[in-house]
A protein has these predicted regions:
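A glycine/proline-hinged amphipathic helix-loop "lid/cap" segment
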Residues: 1-79
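Short strand-loop-helix active-site module centered on a catalytic nucleophile
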Residues: 73, 88, 110, 131-185
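Short beta-strand element of the alpha/beta-hydrolase
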Residues: 83-93
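Serine-hydrolase catalytic-loop signature spanning alpha/beta hydrolases and amidase-signature enzymes
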Residues: 94-97, 102, 118, 144
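Short, small-residue-enriched loops and turns at beta-alpha junctions
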Residues: 96, 127-128
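Short, conserved loop/turn and helix-capping segments at secondary-structure boundaries
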Residues: 100-104, 132-135
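Short amphipathic alpha-helix adjacent to the substrate-entry channel of hydrolases
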Residues: 101-119
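Short beta-to-alpha linker loops that shape the active-site pocket of alpha/beta-hydrolase fold enzymes
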Residues: 122-126
């Protein structure tokens, strides 16, 4: 297992505080609840480092499982139409949970409605990884997408924390990643 990044007041520490509050029904933070939460977060971190199962049963069509800069990425709905919309979907889960069936079904339904291809990265999660690593991998994915598709046909989409990640990535691209071509819509 990779080393867990320890930083003062980060998503990792905030997540731990939330878990402590949720697991401490009668009393505030105790050594027992803190140990329980740390064990839970370590188990979650180990689980997040393993490959995610292919979601073909959820999207009901063939799904390519590929690696983009070491980031597992699922792709489906591929067509020969050069103007096909592409949804780059970032799932929610508090930046630390893997996607669930709902994420795949929802984006698949939306994509079918507009005839879009879906790129669904299983992005790096806290507490092992940070936003800088995630943004770097997303930039590589985005560059691969626009090498084949027009930037104006790319749609950044996400739910919950994934929506925040998509918005943050779009803002970061606009400010710090001047070499990237921006999509016309986010």
């Amino acid at each position: 297992m990779k080393k867990i990044i320890a930083c003062p007041r980060t998503f990792s520490s905030d997540a731990l505080n939330v878990l402590l509050k949720l697991t401490s029904k009668r009393s505030p933070k105790t050594e027992k609840t803190e140990a329980h939460c740390r064990k839970y977060i370590q188990a979650l971190a180990a689980k997040n480092e393993k490959p995610f199962p292919n979601p073909e049963k959820d999207v009901r069509q063939p799904v390519e499982d590929c690696s983009v800069d070491g980031m597992q990425t699922f792709v489906w709905g591929i067509s020969t139409d050069p103007d096909q919309p592409v949804i780059l979907y970032l799932h929610g889960g508090a930046y630390m949970n893997q996607p669930v069936s709902f994420h795949f079904k929802m984006v698949s339904h939306i994509a079918a409605g507009i005839g879009a291809k879906v790129c669904f990265p299983v992005y790096p999660k806290i507490p092992v990884h940070d936003h800088k690593e995630t943004y770097t991998k997303l930039k590589t994915l985005y560059e691969q997408v626009i090498a084949v598709h027009k930037p104006e046909n790319v749609i950044f989409m996400g739910d919950s924390s994934g929506a925040g990640l998509a918005l943050g990535f779009a803002c970061r691209m606009g400010k710090a990643m001047k070499s990237c071509t921006m999509p016309s819509k986010t």
